[in-house]
Amino acid sequence: MARKSLIQREKGRLKLENKYHFIRRSSKNEISKVPSLSDKWEIYGKLESPPRNSAPTRLRRRCFYTGRPRANYRDFGLCGHILREMVNACLLPGATRSSW
């Protein structure tokens, strides 16, 4: 189990990312449209104004069940340990153990 403080920190980052998503996207679109370098620098300044934790690269995908940050499978939202346990217990529909 991940520490609860880390999970809450990640939730806060997700809220910030959703809040500033439109500002970042519009600034990046403006940069590609503006031909002059001085105007681009001004827009880069706007990109630096939102908080650091609002950047999408600061987010980390976590296991839905345990909060573990590593070995996550996007399709299920689970880490490898829990995924294996759930497949063995036949709790995930459509997922089977491989055998050859």
Curated annotation (Swiss-Prot):
Chain ranges passing through the membrane: none
GO biological process terms, semicolon-separated: translation
One cellular-component annotation, GO: plastid
Gene: rps14
Lineage: Eukaryota, Viridiplantae, Streptophyta, Embryophyta, Tracheophyta
Quaternary structure and partners: Part of the 30S ribosomal subunit.
One of the Pfam families matching this protein, by short name: Ribosomal_S14
Places the protein is found: Plastid
Xref: Gene3D superfamilies: 1.10.287.1480
Main location: plastid
Keyword Transferase in record: no
UniProt organism field: Epifagus virginiana (Beechdrops)
Record family assignment: Belongs to the universal ribosomal protein uS14 family.
Keyword tags: Plastid, Ribonucleoprotein, Ribosomal protein
Known function: Binds 16S rRNA, required for the assembly of 30S particles.
Full protein name: Small ribosomal subunit protein uS14c
Molecular function GO labels: structural constituent of ribosome
